[in-house]
Amino acid sequence: ISGMILSGGYPELHGKELAANRTMRQSVKEAIKQGMPCIAECGGFLYLHRELEDQDGIFYPMAEVLDAKAYRTNKLGRFGYINLTANEAQLLGDKGMTIRGHEFHYWESEQCGESFHAKKPVGKRQWDCVNGNETLYAGFPHLFFWSAPEAACTFLKKCEEYGTC
């Protein structure tokens, strides 16, 4: 395996089962620690936390890539389409690169990150988000790669480089 994409999937509905699979949690943590490129969007982002609160209010251990808790809120969090601009060079490209995405979640994180700046296409709402570095994109926004195909190419190139190490 040369890279990972951890997209949605509602891990908060399967906290007990995910926590019980220690081998998988440790494998994901070690792969990312060793530099395997990883895109973790929304539910995948939640899985990378130290702990995740399930729908019944019980916290379970997750992959521990991020030293933070992810927890339930009683309201819909940031919702809808957004434009993302990279605040720094990271897995998907250089500082200033842009890509569209969307968010839809009732969960929140103690560590939302600040590798990207999100802005609603209509209105003034904006915020920093995403934990990123040369090999990791981990945040709530789901990415729309058709809006920035070069970001997908950059990710695949980094996967190829990792696979030949």
Which residues fall in each region the model found?
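Structural motif
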Residues: I5-G8, I39, A138-F140
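Glycine-centered secondary-structure boundary/capping sites
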Residues: I5, T23-M24, E160
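Short, flexible active-site loops
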Residues: G8-G15, C129-N131
